[in-house]
Amino acid sequence: MGKFEEALEKYANYVVKKAKENLAKGGKYGSYNKSGALSSSLSYKINKGKVSFLSDNYGVFLDKGVKGAKSTYPESRTSPHKYTTKMPPSSVFDKWTIKSGIAPRDKKGRFIKRKSLNFLIARSIYRKGIRATMFFTKPFEDALPLFEDDILEGFLEDNLNLEE
């Protein structure tokens, strides 16, 4: 492995580490990573001098946000993604509601069925969208100035055979 790929490796390691920290730290309402699946899916691959960052599919939506069908969070205004005709399936929120310990009650004080709660959450997300967290974008952009000199030096050393 050349100096260029070593520098890319350091850069990619830093970005993934910071993205995982952002997921664990979360935001105003707690962790963005209740199950740990997204965090454990974050990785990178270096191939022919290019870095590819990998994650579960929904990582993109959590990072960039999704515009809602009726309204949009200010953080998600620039998102390329938007709910138009279909709601997210309510079943995907089942494990999340259990781990979150959410157990709301109706007007008579009875617990709402989990299936109904999952539907209400899915409908709210469909209407309002998903707030952009920038858990990956921020470390990706912040790391460039930190590692650009190392990456450039590594590239020049590997390709121009510079002697010091």
Where are these predicted regions, by residue range?
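Charged, low-complexity interaction tracts
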Residues: A37-E164
